[in-house]
Amino acid sequence: MFNILYAFGWLFTLLPLRVLYFFSDLFYPIVYYIIRYRKSVVRTNLEKSFPDKTQKELRKIERRFYRFFCDLFLETLYEINISEAEIKRRFSFVNIEGLLEQHAGGKGILIMTAHYGNWEWGMNFPLFIAEDIVSCQIYKGLSNKQFDRFMYNLRAKYGGINVEKRELLRTMIKYKSGNDQGIYWMISDQTPAAQKIHYWTEFLHQDTPTLTGTEQLARKFDYAVFYAEIKRIKRGYYQCELIPITLKSAQTTEFEITEKYMRMLQKTIEDEPEYWLWSHRRWKYTRN
């Protein structure tokens, strides 16, 4: 079944993106009004995150989120056949020079991003740097083996190295011993497992458990840390600004990096909330 769906998807993505957006407009009312995909989760998340907004304002954000969600799904499929030239035309970086300056000075780099905008297109970062620079993205395997293979290959399409979470420390030690300490993309807005919650913060008006592994590694190896803020410029076009969180991680206090990241992400979401993945059960744990 997966092979059939993949073949259909592959043929589908031969169409121009503007045609795929026509289908996205058709899918939106089906997903929003009929399937109602995770609507209760989305609605609850929005209501708790923006307690000062009216129901009318919240529903407007909700509808915009689902429209973007349909676009995002087809943009991800479109990546199967997208060319290097088109990726570079549709996705751009700001301050990549500042990041590469730190890397050239011998620093390893950790990039903290989120499920915001088109983060999958951001994984094509290796296209924007020299081929000999080690660029890794942390990859969590999916339960469906065939879909897992599809996403694994898609993310590695343009030279990025997929690193399983359990192999991350070993990989970082390996590259630290060489001339290139590497650049690592981390999707850092996920919910940690209950037994691995070490830090809570107020995020979008709610007590929120946070991942702290990126900070721990940054402080251990004294890597520079950047926040990748992805903005949607217009339909099908994105800009990612690489904002320094710290260039001297070893000098930071415990949870300082995590807290700065969460504040930056909150500002991004508050500015344009419809582009965050509201269907994720981000607040499934409560603080005792």
Residue ranges of each PLM-predicted region?
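Membrane-anchoring hydrophobic helices of lipid-metabolizing enzymes
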Residues: 1-113, 118, 153, 159
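A broad structural signal for alpha-helix termini and local helix breaks/kinks
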Residues: 15, 34, 49-51, 130, ...
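Residues that cap or flank secondary-structure elements
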Residues: 34, 90-91, 142-143, 164, ...
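Residue-level recognition of alpha-helix initiation/capping sites
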Residues: 37, 93, 117, 145-146, ...
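Non-catalytic C-terminal accessory region of glycerolipid acyltransferases
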Residues: 60-63, 128, 153, 166-288
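Catalytic core of membrane glycerolipid acyltransferases/transacylases, capturing the structured
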Residues: 105-166, 193-202
